């Protein structure tokens, strides 16, 4: 039983630290980064930093329309948020 619990915790912790993968699509199908950021700004986001991650995400750091500090991983093809982290 202890071994099963230990394995469960080990597997769970390794997936918790896995990097966020947003897409496997060819880069030619991705949205234009500048146009994508402009769309976010139109929705009320303030972008302090924007980057493309090693795991094929558009990652934004800044503030949402409610003024909360956020870090968001976006699928660069669809623009949908894959992961959102709020920071105090």
Please report, for each region that a protein language model flagged, where it lies by residue.
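Positively charged n-region of N-terminal signal peptides that target proteins for export
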Residues: 1-4
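N-terminal signal peptide c-region/cleavage motif recognized by signal peptidases
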Residues: 13-16
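Short, non-transmembrane alpha-helical segments in secretory-pathway proteins
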Residues: 23-47
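Conserved histidines in hydrophobic membrane contexts and catalytic metal-binding motifs
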Residues: 58-61, 71, 79
């Amino acid at each position: 039983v202890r071994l099963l619990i230990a394995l469960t915790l080990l597997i769970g912790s390794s997936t918790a630290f896995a990097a966020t993968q947003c897409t496997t699509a060819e880069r030619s199908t991705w949205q234009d980064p500048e146009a994508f950021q402009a769309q976010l700004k139109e929705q009320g986001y303030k972008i302090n930093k924007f980057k493309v991650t090693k795991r094929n995400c558009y990652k934004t750091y800044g503030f949402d329309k409610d003024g909360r500090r956020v870090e968001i991983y976006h699928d660069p093809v669809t623009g949908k948020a894959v992961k959102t982290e709020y920071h105090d």
